[in-house]
Amino acid sequence: METLELQGAKLRYHQVGQGPVLIFIPGANGTGDIFLPLAEQLKDHFTVVAVDRRDYGESELTEPLPDSASNPDSDYRVKRDAQDIAELAKSLSDEPVYILGSIVAMHVLKDYPEVVKKIAFHEPPINTFLPDSTYWKDKNDDIVHQILTEGLEKGMKTFGETLNIAPIDAKMMSQPADTEEGRIEQYKRTMFWSEFEIRQYTHSDITLDDFTKYSDKITLLNGTDSRGSFPQDVNFYINKETSIPIVDIPGGHLGYIQKPEGFADVLLNMWG
């Protein structure tokens, strides 16, 4: 893996291929290895970069997180993630880059539009700008409380039911790692995401105006196998309010690992 030293962290990332830079930003998984099958499909067309977000996988903190980062309304981590991606983009290319992601990608576009050539938001589970935002914020508060008091298994079951996660995704999300060490790491990673990201990222400061001013750069992606899920509803709402196009892409919420060949074909039709 490659390394970029940043304030407070060593950011590590996979890099394969040649051509214009395309950065993949992981969501709850946190690590870029989930994108490697997709990267193999695209490496003849792009320099594909798959990041381990700070404090996930091989990326390591060199300074501790501020105590406030676990506060439900803290934007420290999502803003820091966005800054990391912007600094990575600038280190890799003198030109704006392509980006695929979700909520972090939205903050990259909002705060660092100069690094973005084209960007795709794949099923972002954000609620801030929705008419029923308070309802979803309260639901996420309840889910995190349940995880922290009743256990991860029960809380994640509620999470899947509340967001109407598709069976193809629920099966993959619940699949344990192959080794005991892997299962321990998986548990730690999910607990970290629960405490520091479920509430903070999904209710972070993004508005529809943040999209309309850069609408020519944005594509919304919804999976063909995750119809009816909450993240898809978010994209439908963005589309209704801004007319930013939605493109169907193979697979579910984790389509890039479920159906990488078809997923790559859609990206190439968009950007190739």
Swiss-Prot record:
Its EC number is 3.-.-.-. InterPro entries: AB_hydrolase_1 (IPR000073), AB_hydrolase_fold (IPR029058), AB_hydrolase_sf (IPR050266). This is Uncharacterized hydrolase SAS2467. One of its GO terms (molecular function) is hydrolase activity. It comes from the Bacteria. Pfam families: Abhydrolase_1. Keywords: Hydrolase. It comes from Staphylococcus aureus (strain MSSA476). Belongs to the AB hydrolase superfamily.
